[in-house]
C-alpha cells in the first residue's frame, strides 16, 4: 500500500507548519492540524496558528469550535476521519501537522474511541485482578490488539477492557486504512530554547496579551482561560495581577521549554513502541531531506 498520509511532528517552535505547507504545496496536499488548541476560534496568537503561512493551502481542524467547548481526542479522531476522507476522495494527499502526541497516536495507532459509560460492576470485579491478569483479560477481549500502550498502566488497562467488552456486541465504525510516512523535526536543545524564547517575544509584541484580555471581555473567566495552555495560563495570571510582566515572561518561557522536553519524550516513546519517524535536522535543509526520503519511498515530489 503506497503512502496515503504524510505526518510532520516535532516540539513547539520547531518549524512544523512551514515544512508541512511546503510539502503540501509540492504534493497536492492539504493540511490536517493535530494541535489540541488550534481548534478554538479567537485563540490565534496564543496558539500559534500562523494562518498566513498556509497561503492557498487548504487546512482542516483549525477554528472549528468556540472556547468553552470540550474538544478531546475522541472529537479529534472523528474530525480527522472526516477530513481524511474529504481530502483523499478528491485525489489529494493529507498532510497531518502537529505536536499533540495523544492526537498523533490516536490516528497512527488507529485507536477506536467510543463513548462508553463506566461500568461500576465490571470495575469492582477487575479491582481484584493483578496487572498480569488484566493484561490477559484485555488480550482476550481484543485479540487483534497491536498497540500495547494500554498494557503499561493499570487505569488504562481497566478502561481498555471496559471499552473492548462494551464494543464486543456492537458493529465497529470503520477506520481508514493508513500507510503513513512520518517526518520529525529536531534541533539541538540550546537552539530550540532560543527559538522558543524568540517566538514568545514576537507573540507578545504581536498582541497576545490583548488577545487574551479580549477573550476575557467576551465572557470567558480567567480561571477557564488557564486551561487552554501555558500562554493563556500565565498571561491570565498577569492580567489578574498575580504576576508582574517580567515574572510572567520568565515563568512562561521556562514552562514552554519544559513542555518542549515533554513533547520530545513523547515522540521517543512512540519510537520505542514501533512508530518509525524519519528525523530531519532543523538547522539543515529539512525540506531537501524530506524530498529525498520521499524519492526513496517512490512518492512523486
UniProtKB/Swiss-Prot annotation:
Pfam families hit by this protein: IPPT (PF01715)
EC category name: transferase
InterPro entries, A to Z: Dimethylallyltransferase, IPT, P-loop_NTPase
Annotated site (Interaction with substrate tRNA): 100
GO molecular function terms attached to this record: ATP binding; tRNA dimethylallyltransferase activity
Enzyme Commission identifier(s): 2.5.1.75
Cofactor: Mg(2+)
Residues bound to ATP: 10-17
Gene Ontology annotations of biological process type: tRNA modification
Secretion signal span: none
Alphabetical keyword list: ATP-binding, Magnesium, Nucleotide-binding, Transferase, tRNA processing
Catalytic reaction equation(s): adenosine(37) in tRNA + dimethylallyl diphosphate = N(6)-dimethylallyladenosine(37) in tRNA + diphosphate
Region (Interaction with substrate tRNA): 35-38
Residue positions binding substrate: 12-17
Disulfide bonds: none
Assembly and interaction partners: Monomer.
Entry similarity comment: Belongs to the IPP transferase family.
HAMAP family: IPP_trans (MF_00185)
Function text: Catalyzes the transfer of a dimethylallyl group onto the adenine at position 37 in tRNAs that read codons beginning with uridine, leading to the formation of N6-(dimethylallyl)adenosine (i(6)A).
NCBIfam families for this protein: miaA (TIGR00174)
Name the UniProt record assigns to this protein: tRNA dimethylallyltransferase 1
Source species: Geotalea uraniireducens (strain Rf4)
Upper taxonomic lineage: Bacteria, Pseudomonadati, Thermodesulfobacteriota, Desulfuromonadia, Geobacterales
Amino acid at each position: 500500500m503506497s503512502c496515503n498520509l504524510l505526518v510532520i511532528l516535532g516540539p513547539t517552535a520547531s518549524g512544523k507548519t512551514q515544512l508541512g505547507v511546503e510539502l503540501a504545496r509540492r504534493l497536492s496536499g492539504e493540511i490536517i492540524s493535530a494541535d489540541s488548541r488550534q481548534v478554538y476560534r479567537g485563540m490565534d496568537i496564543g496558539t500559534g496558528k500562523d494562518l498566513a503561512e498556509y497561503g492557498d493551502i487548504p487546512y482542516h481542524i483549525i477554528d472549528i469550535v468556540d472556547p468553552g467547548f470540550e474538544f478531546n481526542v475522541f472529537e479529534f479522531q472523528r474530525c480527522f476521519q472526516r477530513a481524511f476522507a474529504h481530502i483523499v476522495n478528491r485525489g489529494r494527499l493529507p498532510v497531518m501537522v502537529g505536536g499533540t502526541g495523544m492526537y498523533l497516536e490516536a490516528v497512527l495507532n488507529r485507536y477506536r474511541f467510543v463513548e462508553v459509560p463506566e461500568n461500576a460492576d465490571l470495575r469492582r470485579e477487575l479491582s481484584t485482578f493483578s496487572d498480569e491478569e488484566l493484561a490477559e483479560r484485555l488480550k482476550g477481549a481484543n485479540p487483534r490488539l497491536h498497540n500495547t500502550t494500554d498494557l503499561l498502566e493499570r487505569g488504562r488497562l481497566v478502561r481498555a477492557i471496559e471499552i473492548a467488552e462494551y464494543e464486543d456486541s456492537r458493529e465497529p465504525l470503520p477506520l481508514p486504512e493508513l500507510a503513513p510516512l512520518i517526518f520529525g523535526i529536531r534541533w539541538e536543545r540550546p537552539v530550540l530554547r532560543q527559538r522558543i524564547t524568540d517566538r514568545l517575544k514576537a507573540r507578545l509584541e504581536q498582541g497576545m496579551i490583548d488577545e487574551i484580555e479580549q477573550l476575557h471581555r467576551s465572557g470567558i473567566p480567567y480561571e477557564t482561560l488557564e486551561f487552554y495552555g501555558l500562554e493563556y495560563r500565565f498571561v491570565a495570571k498577569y492580567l489578574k495581577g498575580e504576576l508582574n510582566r517580567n515574572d510572567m515572561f520568565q515563568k512562561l518561557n521556562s514552562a514552554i521549554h519544559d513542555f518542549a522536553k515533554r513533547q520530545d519524550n513523547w515522540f521517543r516513546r512512540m519510537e520505542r513502541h514501533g512508530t518509525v519517524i524519519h528525523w530531519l535536522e532543523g538547522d539543515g535543509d529539512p525540506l531537501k531531506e524530506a524530498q529525498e526520503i520521499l524519492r526513496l519511498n517512490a512518492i512523486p515530489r
